[in-house]
């Protein structure tokens, strides 16, 4: 498998050979779906909470007498049928949203995503990506010159200048290979990988 090598203007200067094990796999939609769903589920805080009929503030006094009013009988105002009453099946903060996915499946899913990106021309290689100062404008101008407005950069090493320059840019994310996730890979229109990061990705997902 070959992918484009981009210059500073975002133009293809040549092609580089990449590992078929990581970038030449068949597209497995169901596996990719599993990997992304598991990633999103495991990222949930699980802190949402609602109150049931015991937890809402209420009085145990009977709202009105049992008979003679023509209304349906009611025992207390905390009933889920009443405004301000508790939920029947409330969301509780101890709910576990964890989705287990095997390491082999995760590696295969990530490799399938990288392979599809390469086939679609959304994956490209750059020699390196550095900035001399932690200025957002410097990095923004660099991507503007490359005609990129939605890009995930996987760099072998993200120094302080690069991190500070990129963190305030919309639709730009710079990460190291170990922090690359399936959701970001499919979200951004273009994925740039430095040459050194390519070797790390091969070790991680081969």
Curated annotation (Swiss-Prot):
Binding partners and assembly: Part of the 50S ribosomal subunit.
Keyword tags: Ribonucleoprotein, Ribosomal protein, RNA-binding, rRNA-binding
SUPFAM superfamilies listed in its UniProt record: Ribosomal protein L4
Any one biological process term the GO annotation gives: translation
InterPro entries, A to Z: Ribosomal_uL4, Ribosomal_uL4-like, Ribosomal_uL4_dom_sf
Name this polypeptide is given: Large ribosomal subunit protein uL4
PANTHER family: 50S RIBOSOMAL PROTEIN L4, LARGE RIBOSOMAL SUBUNIT PROTEIN UL4M
Record organism: Polaromonas naphthalenivorans (strain CJ2)
GO molecular-function terms, A-Z: rRNA binding; structural constituent of ribosome
Encoding gene (name): rplD
Region (Disordered): 46-77
Family the entry assigns: Belongs to the universal ribosomal protein uL4 family.
């Amino acid at each position: 498998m070959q992918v484009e090598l981009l210059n500073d203007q975002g133009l293809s200067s040549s092609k580089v050979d990449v590992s078929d094990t990581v970038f030449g796999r068949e597209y497995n939609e169901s596996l990719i779906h599993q990997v992304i769903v598991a990633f999103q589920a495991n990222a949930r805080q699980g802190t949402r909470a609602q109150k049931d009929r015991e937890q809402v503030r209420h009085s145990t006094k009977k709202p009105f007498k049992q008979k003679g009013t023509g209304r349906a009988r009611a025992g207390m105002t905390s009933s889920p049928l009443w405004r301000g009453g508790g939920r029947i099946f409330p969301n509780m903060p101890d709910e576990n949203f964890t989705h287990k996915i095997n390491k082999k499946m995760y590696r295969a899913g990530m490799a399938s995503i990288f392979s599809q990106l390469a086939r679609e021309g959304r994956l490209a290689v750059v020699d390196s990506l550095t900035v001399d100062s932690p200025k957002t404008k410097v990095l923004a101008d660099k991507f503007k010159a490359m005609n990129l407005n939605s890009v995930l950069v996987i760099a072998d090493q993200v120094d302080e200048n690069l991190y500070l320059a990129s963190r305030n840019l919309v639709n730009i994310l710079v990460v190291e290979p170990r922090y690359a996730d399936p959701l970001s890979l499919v979200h951004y229109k273009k994925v740039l990988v430095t040459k050194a990061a390519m070797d790390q990705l091969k070790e991680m997902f081969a």
